[in-house]
Design a protein with these regions (language model features):
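Divalent-metal coordination cores built from histidine and acidic residues
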Residues: 180, 346-354, 360, 369-519
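Solvent-exposed helix/loop surface patches that form functional interfaces
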Residues: 42-52, 58, 62-65, 132-223, ...
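Histidine-rich, glycine-flanked metal-binding segment
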Residues: 312-354
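C-terminal motif of bacterial Sec signal peptides marking the signal peptidase cleavage site
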Residues: 18-20
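Extracellular/periplasmic ectodomains of large secreted or surface enzymes and adhesion receptors
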Residues: 33, 260-304, 338
Length: 519
């Protein structure tokens, strides 16, 4: 029987937690400069000037104590690096500097951060400036005052004073990775509390999800899996080694795209860690759902709503829908439906019951999407581009009844070579087509999603091989083609409406219309 969804609540599949993303080119002065309670006007100065002051080797030469390199990834494709260095300061503290940067689809995303930390792990000052995505920037600092409070500066906001109570960490969003390293060091040093205050704002919930061995080259390494909530919207996953060092992070960036960072020497583990994050995240969501479950007989009757059956017929008024656990067993007018003895009855008079909704262009980037979708009445999503290991792990867990979420229809994202490419599944020549499509078919992908950097000459052979395997071909129209050429080459659909507009206008007219609309 067709799945139905009762639309009672709609939760946004967006997020708070990016409050540090301010659109400004100016930012804080160099670490340690100025009065901690100084006005916002003290934060002037270009990013380049500030970076020069904060990250230069001015003054007597000091030996670098430690250097850590993290490899940054988007959809498991390496896009940049973060290099963290530690240098002893004259006052006995350690100056940590993070140089974080990546290139996303041809756009540079640079970020710098600096921390001044005592031997006992107290962060005396923190600042970060630069870009957190192609479309957002961060510009802030927090300085520890003598009374134990932090004075927080964000450009465009009045300075505020925050005095943490109990264990706390200093971080703002997913980047830089160094901030998360300090956060987890503080969590361990504080006795692994369930919650910690977050400076500049927020509360963290941190939980160990257990330890597991992973094969690495010719040895096995045991890593502890830790989940963190409150730093970004939803849960992120991190892994620590036996000494508490941060090894890897699987999270979302400021565009809510899949983002991963892994310490140098552990790159080979990233696909397995990403898959583990998806599977464990769905398991965690199931645990949350079970803790909120109310007792019932297993049979539930929704009584009194208007029922729309999706066939085009008029709505059935004063309807009854009966389901037994996850199966709808009866639906229709109250007068014709017998409610089983012992069923839990819920009065939904005044509401409307619809067939489960479909989201036809989704990027199921984190496990919390499952609960949000179901609460919004969405029972099927078509995922049009994701980390294959992550999304198939989530899909399989839900299909096996071990997770919370809608049915997921997976597309396999493929792209060509070049700086603007997305993901790790690359088709550069005809020789790549068969093995790539065999991999996608084996993973249960229903469609091939072509991205923008695929060579136009490869579209037709990709479509031929995809259709042989019963897979549709959809996606972006590659650069160098128009939508008519893509359709003639075998496209079954395009993912964005703008690709349809070009053929409707004379040459040059579309760009004129775009400029007029922008004005």
């Amino acid at each position: 029987m067709r799945k139905l969804a009762l639309l009672l609540l709609a939760l946004p599949i967006g997020a708070a937690g990016l409050g540090a993303c301010h659109r400004s080119a100016a930012g804080p002065a160099a670490p340690g400069s100025g009065d901690p309670s100084g006005s916002v006007s003290n934060l002037k100065g270009s990013t380049e000037e500030r970076a020069g002051r904060a990250l230069s080797d001015e003054g007597p030469k000091r030996a670098t104590k430690e250097v850590t390199v993290y490899h940054l990834h988007k959809f498991l494709r390496k896009i940049g690096t973060e290099r963290d260095s530690a240098t002893p300061a004259p006052d006995g503290t350690i100056e940590w500097k993070a140089n974080f940067g990546f290139q996303d689809r041809g756009n540079e995303v640079p970020l710098a951060a600096a921390f001044r930390v005592t031997d006992s792990g107290v962060i005396k000052s923190y600042e970060a400036w630069g870009s957190t995505s192609r479309m957002s920037v961060i510009d802030e600092r927090a300085i520890l005052d003598s009374d134990g409070s932090y004075v927080v500066h964000r450009l465009g906001e009045a300075p505020k004073r925050v005095k943490p109570q109990g264990p706390f960490a200093v971080a703002s969003g997913y980047a830089p990775v160094l901030a998360q390293d300090f956060m987890l060091r503080k969590w361990i040093a504080s006795g692994r509390p369930q919650t910690m205050a977050l400076i500049p704002e927020g509360t963290l919930t941190i939980e160990s999800r257990g330890k597991e061995p992973y094969p690495l080259e010719d040895k096995s390494v045991e890593l502890e899996h830790v989940s963190v909530r409150g730093l970004a919207w939803g849960r992120e996953d991190v892994w620590l080694d036996g000494s508490g060092k941060l090894i890897a992070v699987v999270t979302r960036d400021a565009e809510f795209d899949a983002f991963q960072a892994v310490r140098e020497g552990y790159l080979a583990l990233l696909p397995a860690l990403s898959a583990s994050a998806g599977a464990d995240g769905v398991k965690w969501m199931s645990e949350v759902a079970k803790s909120a479950e109310r007792p019932s007989s297993g049979v539930i009757a929704l009584v009194g709503a208007d029922l729309v059956d999706g066939t085009g017929k008029p709505a059935v008024q004063d309807a009854v829908v009966i389901y037994d656990r996850d199966k709808i067993v009866a639906a229709g007018p109250r007068a014709k439906i017998t409610i089983p003895a012992g069923a839990t009855t819920i009065d939904v008079t005044g509401k409307t019951i619809l067939p489960g909704l479909w989201d036809m262009h989704a990027h199921f980037g984190q496990v919390e999407h499952g609960a949000a979708y179901l609460a919004s009445g969405v029972t099927t999503v078509r995922d049009l581009g994701n980390v294959l290991e992550f999304i198939t792990g989530v899909r399989d867990a839900i299909d096996a009844g071990k997770g919370l979420g809608p049915r997921i229809l997976v597309d396999g994202l493929v792209d060509g070579a070049g700086q603007k490419a997305v993901g790790t599944i690359i088709i550069k020549s005809n020789a790549d087509i068969v093995p790539v499509l065999d991999r996608l078919k084996k993973a249960g992908c229903l469609e091939v999603k072509i991205y923008s950097s695929i060579e136009p000459s490869l579209v037709k052979p990709i479509a031929v091989e995809a259709h042989k395997r019963g897979m549709r071909v959809v996606g972006h129209v590659p650069e160098g083609m128009d939508v008519v050429e893509a359709l003639n080459a075998g496209f079954d659909g395009v993912s964005h409406a703008q690709y349809l507009f070009g053929p409707l206008f004379a040459p040059g007219e579309m760009s004129k219309l775009s400029r007029s609309t922008l004005r």
